[in-house]
């Protein structure tokens, strides 16, 4: 799949997700964002939630499963707090926004 097709599928999956009201921003990073995915690459997605959101581990797992089902690929779903300090700044600066709550 091309990067644009992946972004379209993610955008559609986000729009249909029951937790959408809690999403602040959803971005693509990693090999697909750089246009260099390998055959077995997963899709790296950074999700930022509204400040008042109470999304826990199980809800995050449901969001990930829903995205995987609708996109048709393995998803690595991360939040800014789950990023390693070593890579955090680079990922936050270079991630490609797919969805942002208006």
Residue ranges with predicted function:
Residues 1-25, 34-39, 50-102:
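Catalytic core of pol beta-like nucleotidyltransferases
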Residues 29-31:
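Glycine-rich beta-strand-to-loop/alpha-helix junction loops that act as flexible
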Residues 41-43:
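Short, conserved active-site loops that position catalytic residues or coordinate cofactors/metal ions
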Residues 46-48:
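Short hydrophobic/aromatic beta-strand micro-patches
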């Amino acid at each position: 799949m091309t990067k644009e097709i992946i972004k379209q599928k993610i955008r559609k999956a986000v729009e249909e997700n029951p937790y959408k009201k809690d999403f602040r921003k959803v971005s693509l990073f990693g090999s697909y964002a750089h246009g260099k995915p390998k055959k077995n690459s997963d899709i790296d997605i950074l999700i930022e939630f509204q400040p008042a959101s109470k999304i826990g581990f199980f809800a995050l797992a449901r969001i990930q499963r829903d995205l995987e089902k609708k996109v048709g690929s393995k998803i690595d779903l991360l939040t800014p707090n789950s990023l390693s300090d070593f890579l955090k700044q680079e990922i936050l600066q270079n991630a490609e926004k797919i969805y942002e709550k208006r």
